[in-house]
Amino acid sequence: MNPLPSRREVGIGRPVSELPLALADLHLSLSTNDRVACWLKPLPGPEWTTGRATDLVIGAGFTPAGSAIVERADVVLDMIRIHSLPDIVAAQMRLLIVGLNPSPYSADHSIGYARPGNRFWPAALAAGIVSADRNPRHALQHHGLGMTDLVRRTTQRADELNRAEFVSGFERVERLTAWLKPQAVCFVGLGGWRAVVDRKASSGVQDRTLGDRPVYVMPHTSGLNAHCRLEDLVAHFRAAAELADRA
């Protein structure tokens, strides 16, 4: 049984668009299964709703332990920190990267695609869409590259996830995209897109948008994906960046 939650105040007087990084900081400061009564206190406005608050804490790697409570313009959520990764996102992103779900290694290191054999960061560096290795904050702040996953539950293998999780996660990411409006969205791994949108989808620009933003889908960057070479992944990242710059 989880102990009574400690109280944390997050985002006091800040724009709602800054809450994802503030919640990411909270996630990093806690241990798995820590329980928190989180008071979200951003600047009030039409974009601030209980639904958005719930989406943001899920994206930050927490599980709500009850319904949101509204106190004036504040939203209070009792939540539990899970073994996962937080969204690293903000307004004015050039490209939003959407993965499937965190691996235990990535969750342990608090960095997406952290495993040495994963080719995400080498390919992103070679493509020029980032300039620091395995540093999501630097990628966001200096290159407008945001990172999220369809599902926040950490598993050894993606096939441990079910379609309902993909659908729920897809809906959350679509709301996130419609709100923050990145120039384009890049799905890393075809499995999630195929599970929800088009089971016959292939790599490249998709006909369907996400939150009214153009979408590029590319193969997974895992070193186990022997069908895709590093130079192929570099070309995919460059094509996704070009899509963003045309948007």
PLM feature segments, named:
Residues 145-199:
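Internal catalytic-core helix/loop-beta-alpha segment
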Residues 88-100:
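Short, hydrophobic/glycine-enriched beta-strand segments
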Residues 29-30, 89, 177-180, 208-211:
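Short, conserved loop/helix-junction motifs that constitute active-site signature segments
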Residues 2-9, 39-51, 60-68, 72-90, ...:
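C-terminal capping/extension of enzyme domains
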